[in-house]
Amino acid sequence: MNFLRKTLFPFAILYGFITSIRNFLFDCGILKSHAFPIPVIAVGNLSVGGTGKTPQIEYLIRLLSNKYQIATLSRGYKRKSEGFILANPTSNAEILGDEPFQFYKKFPNIQVAVAANRKNGIERLLSLPNKPEIILLDDAFQHRKVKAGFYILLTAYNDLFINDFMLPTGNLRESRSGAKRANMIIVTKCPKDISELAQNKIKEALINYNNKKAEVFFTFIDYDDKIYSANKALNVNEVKTASKLLLAGIAKPESFFAHLQSQNDECLVYPDHHHFLEKNITDIKEKAKNKIIITTEKDFVRLSEKLNSDNLFYLPIKSLFVNNEKKFDKKIINYVESSTTNG
């Protein structure tokens, strides 16, 4: 934590007080939460950015979409549109936001929608002729006007919420006690070989903020063994020693760079959800002469429309469980099968 953020601690106390009052009003029913008559699963975190929500949503889509009609509902952060939008063939990353557009491109058999007002978004989805059977709420842990039936709280292994502080001193959107709303906690971005002892130590620390009711799971990021352009694929091992331009506009891109980087590579870092401007594209083209460009899947959906290059590739990732994958799947499926209302 840098010195400037430490000096902002009084504002963190004030912000924590305001969010605690808001949560208290929802908990007491003074502020209303709206439930819906289908399974609604909310995936989110207590902190800002970098916990791996997108691969976790994609895991749930793969788990459930073979049997159920799925819809994802996101805010569509930094999109250049307003209101409720249901993804369609004319949609792009600027209209939907990068993550929803990635869902739409990757999973053509599901419905993808964006709405800042999640209550209105769900109502619009349920008014469709082919309305969804399950709704996955992306980054909605703090969106308390909707009462989801199942809450999955994510926290990154190297940045556990129990060690964090309220904004602006730290990165917490609400106090650690907000974890009590979680039905399940997933520690993301773990070492693949994390020991059982380390897992148990983290579990004991986390459930103290959850009234000991949530089960804790551990996942790691699994990188694909290939990179993909619009029309071809290359093995990662083939390009690892080649001279490359690595580019990321995501929160906490260090592991992405570490996985691909060799001695002669150049890395470009942009803010999370960055809108690539013409000057950015010019700079990328200049630096990428005689090199392949590798970026994240989320950045690829934004860049590919502006950087028409056969040398632009992305590296897909998945969220996989260190252990207890079947146990996780069963809990989700049991909730869906037993849920007729979220009330």
UniProtKB/Swiss-Prot annotation:
- Protein name (Swiss-Prot/TrEMBL): Tetraacyldisaccharide 4'-kinase
Source superkingdom: Bacteria
Which family does the UniProt entry place this protein in?
Belongs to the LpxK family.
Organism encoding this protein? Flavobacterium psychrophilum (strain ATCC 49511 / DSM 21280 / CIP 103535 / JIP02/86)
User: Reaction catalysed?
Assistant: a lipid A disaccharide + ATP = a lipid IVA + ADP + H(+)
Query: What NCBIfam families does the record point to?
Result: lpxK (TIGR00682)
Q: What does the record give as its pathway?
A: Glycolipid biosynthesis; lipid IV(A) biosynthesis; lipid IV(A) from (3R)-3-hydroxytetradecanoyl-[acyl-carrier-protein] and UDP-N-acetyl-alpha-D-glucosamine: step 6/6
Q: Which Pfam families match?
A: LpxK (PF02606)
Q: What is its EC number?
A: 2.7.1.130
| GO MF annotations, alphabetized | ATP binding; tetraacyldisaccharide 4'-kinase activity
Which GO terms of the cellular component aspect does the record hold? plasma membrane
UniProt: ATP binding residues: S47, V48, G49, G50, T51, G52, K53, T54
- PANTHER family named among the record's database cross-references: TETRAACYLDISACCHARIDE 4'-KINASE, TETRAACYLDISACCHARIDE 4'-KINASE, MITOCHONDRIAL-RELATED
Can you cite a GO biological process for this protein? lipid A biosynthetic process
> Which EC class heads this enzyme's classification?
transferase
Note the InterPro entries from the entry: LpxK, P-loop_NTPase
- Quote the function comment for this protein: Transfers the gamma-phosphate of ATP to the 4'-position of a tetraacyldisaccharide 1-phosphate intermediate (termed DS-1-P) to form tetraacyldisaccharide 1,4'-bis-phosphate (lipid IVA).
Q: Which HAMAP family match?
A: LpxK
Encoded by which gene?
Answer: lpxK
Keywords annotated in UniProt: ATP-binding, Kinase, Lipid A biosynthesis, Lipid biosynthesis, Lipid metabolism, Nucleotide-binding, Transferase
